[in-house]
């Protein structure tokens, strides 16, 4: 409706002289391209060229949809993949039966040195246990002697002394250590590479 009205107005305003009208029309189209009288000429110039439509084969489209549906059904039927616990997985290199450490042949001097060292260590531990037994025996004898003296002095205190103490258990003790601790020892902070694998748990909604 608007285009027809503008076209009629343009024809009414166009002069009778053909040459003059053509010159004025060219002048108007050149310098007043955005005027209302040339509005219908701007619409085709602002539009985009038509794109060529792709021919879609309905058979191929249907096959692609069917493949996608089959893939979705397969994923839904599959059991949920659990995150593996690497601590319970034995590496294959440790399952090889032929993997054995070569036997080291010791010299006669090294064998004698180790045997003598083992004898000295056994003698040291034997003396240590003998000293511990003697110490415990002396403590028990002193305790029994003190209880007998306490019973003669006060039977009531003796009954309280031999009563079981519920706070003694559970008993916790650290040691004994085979090597003495190093005073003011600061353990070194070593460098390490974190090679822990990160797994993403995928859950399917059924």
From Swiss-Prot:
Protein's name in the database: Large ribosomal subunit protein mL40
Keyword Repressor recorded: no
Family that this chain belongs to: Belongs to the mitochondrion-specific ribosomal protein mL40 family.
Classification lineage: Eukaryota, Metazoa, Chordata, Craniata, Vertebrata
Keywords for this protein: Mitochondrion, Ribonucleoprotein, Ribosomal protein, Transit peptide
Residues forming coiled coils: none
Gene (UniProt): MRPL40
Compartments in which it is found: Mitochondrion
Any one GO molecular-function label of the UniProt entry: RNA binding
Organism: Homo sapiens
Keyword set includes Iron-sulfur: no
Tissue distribution of the protein: Ubiquitous.
Residue span of the annotated presequence: 1-46
Chief location category: mitochondrion
Biological process, per Gene Ontology: anatomical structure morphogenesis; mitochondrial translation
Annotated stretches, region: Disordered: 168-192
């Amino acid at each position: 409706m608007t285009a027809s009205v503008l076209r009629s107005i343009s024809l009414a305003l166009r002069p009778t002289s053909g040459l003059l009208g053509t010159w004025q029309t060219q002048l108007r189209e050149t310098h007043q391209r955005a005027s209302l009288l040339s509005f219908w000429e701007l619409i085709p110039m602002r539009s985009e060229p038509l794109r060529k439509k792709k021919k879609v084969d309905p058979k191929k489209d249907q096959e692609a949809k069917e493949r996608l549906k089959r893939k979705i059904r397969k994923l839904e039927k599959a059991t949920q993949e659990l995150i593996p616990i690497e601590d319970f997985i034995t590496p294959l290199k440790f399952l090889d039966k032929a993997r054995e450490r070569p036997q080291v042949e010791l010299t006669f001097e090294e064998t004698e040195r180790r045997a003598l060292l083992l004898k000295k260590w056994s003698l040291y531990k034997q003396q240590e246990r003998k000293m511990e037994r003697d110490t415990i025996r002396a403590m028990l004898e002193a305790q029994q002697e003190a209880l007998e003296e306490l019973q003669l002095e006060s039977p009531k205190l003796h009954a309280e002394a031999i009563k079981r103490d519920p706070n003694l258990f559970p008993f916790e003790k650290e040691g004994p250590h085979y090597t003495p601790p190093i005073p003011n020892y600061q353990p070194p902070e070593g460098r390490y590479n974190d090679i822990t694998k990160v797994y993403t748990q995928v859950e399917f909604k059924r």
